[in-house]
């Protein structure tokens, strides 16, 4: 940040961080100061934050608070990982945020600096369609029940069906999509929740709902495939 306006907002964020003692606000401030990345504004806007808080609240109510590991696909700037790890209602051992964009990993680590330093957060560059989920998610069956895979970018996957087939049966999932067809990057939007449910069959549905936003409606499903 370099302009007087930028410094003005930086001072506000720093003051709020000192007042609230919020490690998340401190991490956000540090990231804004060190990285000249306009997309941070989009990642932290009210619609994005509202969708992430909706996921956190619904996840807590439907699947509980204790997770051994969370794999976030299409994790972008790492905001969802930060929201979950800073939420005192949850006990989460580790979060891995993956995005295909190589510019995202450093930003995600910075936004999650508090937990990255503690070994509880990691960011990697990878294409979610190329991951061997059976190998990555294999382990102790007891622990596996507490593993969660999150994909809030379903609208970005043109070959969504192929990706979904790769997820092992019984895996706990939290999925989001939307009907925002106006965005060129959204190649797999759905018109309604019923269509999203047909795309994401689950043996156990823990939550299925929708949230109207200003320009679109976001859909979410939580359950075991």
List each language-model region with its residue ranges:
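S-adenosyl-L-methionine
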Residues: 1-68, 100-148
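Conserved SAM-binding loop of SAM-dependent methyltransferases across substrates and taxa
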Residues: 77-92
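C-terminal substrate-binding/active-site "lid" region of AdoMet-derived donor-dependent transferases
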Residues: 158-225
